[in-house]
Amino acid sequence: MGTAELPRWKYSAQVADPARTVKASLREIDVSPKWSREVCQAIKGLRLDKAKKLLEDVIAKKRMIPYRRYRKLRAHHSETRGPGGYPVKVARHLLKLLESLEANAEFKGLDTDKLFITHAVAHKGRTIKKFFPRAFGRASPHNKTLVHIEVMASEMG
């Protein structure tokens, strides 16, 4: 019996200063690719503690995430000055990812109060093929797309 090789994941961004940068990623998670992209755009550029607070507020449905790209037929909300929503499932996964990022920073010896999120993206993962049974013995495809989320933070100041 041969040994099975585990997949090797790479990051889509290059690190300018590896000594002051930390990375964390989630691979093949079952969340919406569209809402993952919107949440990643919302936390990019924030300090780590502010990003965690934003995600906690989204989970508690106190603050909304503005929808910038996937906004057709979405209701307008005064809080976001346009379409927005509460992507709770994505926020839960991303909050765990930010806690992992913070632990990586502490292990590396970085000051977590000075961390800013410099890179947050969601990529499409593999597609799981599923089918809905229909009348007269037919079936319609209903595929599920998994998501890869990667986050990088750098120490500023």
Regions flagged by a language model, labelled:
Residues 14, 120, 154-156:
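Generic beta-structure capping elements
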Residues 37, 115, 145-147:
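Residues at beta-strand starts and edge strands
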Residues 31, 135-136:
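Short, solvent-exposed beta-edge and connector elements
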Residues 50, 124-129, 138, 149:
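A broad, structure-centric signal for solvent-exposed, well-ordered loop/edge residues
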Residues 2-112, 152:
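Ribosome large-subunit tunnel/peptidyl-transferase-proximal elements
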Residues 66-71, 129-132, 143:
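Generic, ordered loop/turn and secondary-structure boundary motif
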